[in-house]
């Protein structure tokens, strides 16, 4: 990796051309420094190195925890330098599957693109009120059924680790009047979306239409009845904060986010995740989305699930960290309630008496090639 200091964002350290997790990298660096610097004074330490954290916490899941004797843990996959993470969400990842009927229609092909969205981390940014391209697409598809002589051929939203920021569709448009209706719908929705999400900084949401074929040919298009069901599914699946909790009801306790969508060859598929600080709320939400799917004729498959890192009100380690931070910096440390899945949930599920907290340097741009650490 080519490391460099970037002064454009303050004094930061970054790596060129990679989205590898900088938080994982700094955790490795800190542990290796402790292991190879004999002049540092500390009690006996155990170091747990894991693999494939970003792709599914697989290293932590496969580890044999009978090897661990320690019962106090510092995790380094967390927030800013003045912040302590005390818990994190568990999750259920689902795939919805629905078949649909097609009807042949003659017309020219148009492409439609929903873009200009901010996107972001599906955990850390989910409470910021940003738009999700799949949710917007659901509204477009539902209203498309009201356009005469314009039909959906297929649709795609590429897989995203975060909040989807772009969706594409192919449409069959019979004539000029249908094109006019379609463009009016696109203009109306674009204005509506920009207004609805302006407070979240979504000033550039766009719905663009472009003719990609001039010759009118016959295409297999989704039936209006099934298109309504697909639109209802995309809009009915909960997105964003489902329930707040904690002090002053200010902590996102349960959230939902769709991450991938595909309509092709008589099959509609949708990927959706529930994240929750409460196991009971996680499974209650899972039950409700399965009921919605059943009403619309869709099947649901659980692809993966993992437990959260529960919040402890009696953590000696967290109390010690608060005390030391106050003594060192003259201010209270901030508390983070993590919204992205992380390894302590897996570890504490295996070792319930483990007392854990999360500390890390300040970083920005997670899951992007702009990820960087502040070093001054």
Task: Set out the residue ranges of the language-model regions.
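Alpha-helical metal-binding/catalytic segments enriched in His/Glu/Asp
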Residues: 6-54, 110-116, 121-144, 171-172, ...
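Acidic/histidine-rich catalytic neighborhood of metal-dependent amide-processing enzymes
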Residues: 12-101, 153, 242-245, 249
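His/Asp/Glu-rich mid-to-C-terminal helical/loop segments that flank catalytic regions of hydrolases
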Residues: 66, 130-147, 176-179, 225-235, ...
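Active-site-adjacent substrate-binding region
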Residues: 130-155, 311-354
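A structural supersecondary motif
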Residues: 147-160, 245-262
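A short beta-alpha structural unit
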Residues: 158, 169-172, 205-220, 257-261, ...
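A conserved active-site cap/scaffold subdomain adjacent to cofactor or substrate pockets
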Residues: 161-244
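Zn-dependent metallopeptidase/amidohydrolase metal-coordination segment
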Residues: 253-255, 259-269, 324, 328-376
């Amino acid at each position: 990796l080519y490391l460099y200091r970037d002064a454009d964002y303050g004094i930061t350290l970054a790596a060129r051309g990679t989205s590898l997790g900088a938080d994982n990298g700094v955790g490795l660096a800190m542990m290796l420094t402790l292991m190879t610097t004999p002049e540092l004074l500390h009690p006996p330490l155990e170091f747990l190195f894991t693999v494939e954290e970003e792709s599914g916490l697989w290293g932590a899941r496969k580890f044999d925890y009978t090897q661990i004797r320690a019962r106090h843990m510092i995790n380094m996959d967390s927030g800013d330098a003045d912040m302590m993470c005390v818990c994190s969400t568990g999750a259920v990842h689902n795939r919805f599957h629905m078949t649909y009927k097609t009807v042949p229609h003659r017309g020219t092909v148009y492409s439609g693109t929903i873009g200009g969205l901010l996107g972001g981390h599906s955990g850390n940014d989910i409470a910021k009120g940003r738009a999700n391209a799949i949710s917007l697409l659901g509204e477009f598809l539902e209203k498309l059924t009201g356009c005469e002589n314009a039909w959906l051929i297929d649709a795609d939203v590429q897989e995203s680790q975060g909040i989807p920021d772009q969706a594409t569709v192919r449409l069959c448009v019979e004539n000029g009047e249908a094109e006019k209706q379609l463009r009016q719908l696109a203009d109306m929705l674009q204005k509506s979306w920009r207004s609805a999400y302006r407070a979240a900084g979504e000033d550039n949401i766009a719905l663009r239409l472009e003719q990609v074929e001039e010759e009118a040919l016959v295409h297999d298009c989704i039936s209006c009845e099934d298109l309504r069901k697909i639109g209802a599914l995309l809009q009915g699946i909960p997105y964003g904060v489902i329930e707040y909790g904690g002090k002053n009801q200010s902590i996102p306790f349960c959230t939902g986010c769709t991450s991938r969508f595909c309509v092709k060859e008589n099959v509609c598929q949708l990927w959706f995740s529930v994240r929750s600080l409460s196991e009971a709320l996680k499974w209650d939400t899972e039950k409700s989305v399965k009921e919605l799917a059943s009403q619309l004729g869709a099947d649901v498959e659980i692809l993966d699930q993992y437990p959260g890192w529960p919040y402890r009100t009696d953590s000696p380690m967290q109390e010690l960290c608060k005390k030391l931070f106050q003594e060192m910096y003259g201010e209270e440390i901030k508390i983070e309630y993590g919204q992205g899945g992380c390894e302590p949930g897996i570890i504490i599920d295996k070792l319930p008496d483990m007392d854990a907290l999360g500390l890390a340097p300040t970083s920005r741009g997670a899951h992007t090639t702009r990820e960087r650490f502040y070093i001054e």
